[in-house]
From Swiss-Prot:
Protein name, UniProt field: Large ribosomal subunit protein uL10
Family stated for the protein in its record: Belongs to the universal ribosomal protein uL10 family.
Region (Disordered): 299-342
Keywords carried by this UniProt record: Ribonucleoprotein, Ribosomal protein, RNA-binding, rRNA-binding
SUBUNIT field: Part of the 50S ribosomal subunit, binds large rRNA. Forms the ribosomal stalk which helps the ribosome interact with GTP-bound translation factors. Forms a heptameric L10(L12)2(L12)2(L12)2 complex, where L10 forms an elongated spine to which the L12 dimers bind in a sequential fashion.
CDD domains, per the entry: Ribosomal_P0_L10e
Region annotated Required for interaction with ribosomal protein L12 dimers, chain positions: 212-342
Cystine crosslinks: none
Length: 342
């Protein structure tokens, strides 16, 4: 039987103890991180109540299996499937989604390397550069960067996108970007998988658009609120709106029935007055008294003054169409949320 070094046994024991001490265990790839950024990340993680431990992949695997067995949590052992590249163990009290967001927000820019894939579009900005005239001007122009010499310095004539997200950096472009001090790459801890409460989360699950979900939940809340009010389902959030709706409905019925109260008297009189004017419009002018004629004339002037122009009519039609489209999109969003939560 091969002899196992004592330090390896101790390392596995310490890693297993660490895993058992926290509710959230993440496997992260540290292989792309230089020493200084890695030390900064260790500090940030400690400040946020976690710990990062880098070790050999085989020892991490043994530690996970040991911890899973001792905790009686066989699902924890599924993490082993995601050990890859230069793995490290990150333990924390953050939930997996907050942890993923935290690591993404703390990625740092890095210099261009030939053969590397850029995570986002790379733009060379317009303006003067610190570069002196020389062969680099021709090299830039050959790569489609509009450069020329102005006042003894190399100047870029306009903002130029030299790489789209997902494209590979060529050696020639890497030289130019490094000369300009443009750092198109990012270094950080890449999440391989995160374990919490019997579930292993992968990066594709953790990379959610928070604002999109917030918008969906807000729309769902409004739809639920409106539904509850319309079916008179009382809750602390809806009771006031339900009472207001009931009051307005009762008031409308009372007005229609001509039932006089202090709340309805003005509306009933106003309704009768408008009915009187409508009837007066149908009668010959010679049977009307002067007061009624004055009222009809004033009503006609108000109608002319408030008549919308053709441009306003078009704008109203456009607004109505936009409202219909918005209602349709809200219905689609609600349907999507219903599908999401079953």
């Amino acid at each position: 039987m091969a002899h196992v070094a004592e330090w390896k046994k101790k390392e596995v024991e310490e890693l297993a103890k660490l895993i058992k001490s926290y509710p959230v265990i993440a496997l992260v790839d540290v292989s792309s991180m230089p020493a200084y950024p890695l030390s900064q990340m260790r500090r940030l993680i400690r400040e946020n109540g976690g710990l990062l431990r880098v070790s050999r992949n085989t020892l991490i695997e043994l530690a996970i299996k040991k911890a899973a067995k001792e905790l009686g949590k066989p699902e924890l052992e599924k993490l082993v499937e995601y050990i890859d590249r230069g793995a490290g163990i990150l333990v924390t009290n953050m939930n997996p989604f907050k942890l993923y967001k935290f690591l993404q927000q703390n990625r740092q820019p890095a210099p261009a390397k030939p053969g590397a894939v850029v995570p986002k579009d790379v733009v060379v900005p317009a303006g003067p550069t610190p570069l002196a005239p020389g062969p680099i001007v021709g090299q830039m122009q050959a790569l489609g960067i509009p450069a020329r010499i102005e006042k003894g310095k190399v100047t870029i004539q306009k903002d130029t996108t030299v790489l789209k997200a997902g494209e590979v950096i060529t050696p020639e472009l890497a030289n130019i970007l490094n000369a300009l001090g443009i750092q198109p790459l990012e270094v950080g801890l890449d999440v391989l998988a995160v374990y919490e409460d019997g579930i292993v989360y992968t990066p594709d699950v953790l990379a959610i658009d928070e604002q999109e979900y917030i918008d969906m939940l807000q729309k769902a809340y409004m739809h639920a609120f409106n539904l509850a009010v319309n079916i008179a389902y009382p809750t602390p959030e809806t009771i006031e709106a339900i009472i207001q709706k009931a009051f307005l409905n009762a008031k409308t019925v009372a007005i229609e029935a001509g039932y006089i109260t202090k709340e309805t008297i003005q509306d009933i009189i106003g309704r009768a007055f408008r009915a009187m004017l409508l009837l007066a419009q149908q009668l010959p002018e010679d049977v009307l008294d002067e007061k009624t004629k004055e009222l009809l004339s004033a009503q006609a002037q108000v109608a002319v003054a408030t008549q919308p122009s053709e441009e306003e009519k078009k704008e109203e039609e456009k607004t109505e169409e936009e409202e219909k489209e918005e209602e349709a999109s809200e219905e689609e969003a609600l349907a999507g949320l219903s599908a999401l939560f079953g």
